[in-house]
Amino acid sequence: MRRKPKTLPPTLRDKNRYIAFQVTGERPFKKEMIKKAIWDVSLKTLGELGTARAKPWFIKFDEKTQTGIVRCDRKYVEEIRFVLTLITEINGSKAIVRTLGVSGTIKRLKMKFLKEFGWK
């Protein structure tokens, strides 16, 4: 029988922050387009090492309201917000990504910043 590895106590786990964002563009965008744009701009701006340290992770995107959630390390929130503002083109069409807010939990992020867009 294989034993499960022990889980890390909360004091040793990575502290994450969740960033809510909204995309405004010439046309509606799909989830994969947004994910690729965030990843590409992050690599260009922060480099491979900076991106690895910031740990940006695409959580969710609603294609109807064009809003989504990105997770990152708490020390690199400003860098990821900067990366989001640098996105000017997604898949050949112009776009603007606006940061709605930052929170420590997805539940609180949805309540504070994404409730007006119909998130539950």
From Swiss-Prot:
Its EC number is 3.1.26.5. It catalyses: Endonucleolytic cleavage of RNA, removing 5'-extranucleotides from tRNA precursor. It is an enzyme of class 3 (hydrolase). GO terms for molecular function: ribonuclease P activity. One of its GO terms (cellular component) is ribonuclease P complex. The keyword Hydrolase applies. Consists of a catalytic RNA component and at least 4-5 protein subunits. The gene is rnp2. One of its GO terms (biological process) is tRNA 5'-leader removal. This is Ribonuclease P protein component 2. It is found in: Cytoplasm. It comes from Thermococcus sibiricus (strain DSM 12597 / MM 739). Belongs to the eukaryotic/archaeal RNase P protein component 2 family. PANTHER family: RIBONUCLEASE P PROTEIN SUBUNIT P14 (PTHR15441), RIBONUCLEASE P_MRP PROTEIN SUBUNIT POP5 (PTHR15441:SF2). Its main location: cytoplasm. Keywords: Cytoplasm, Endonuclease, Hydrolase, Nuclease, tRNA processing. Transmembrane segments: none annotated. InterPro entries: Pop5/Rpp14/Rnp2-like, Rnp2-like_sf, Rnp2_archaea. Part of ribonuclease P, a protein complex that generates mature tRNA molecules by cleaving their 5'-ends.
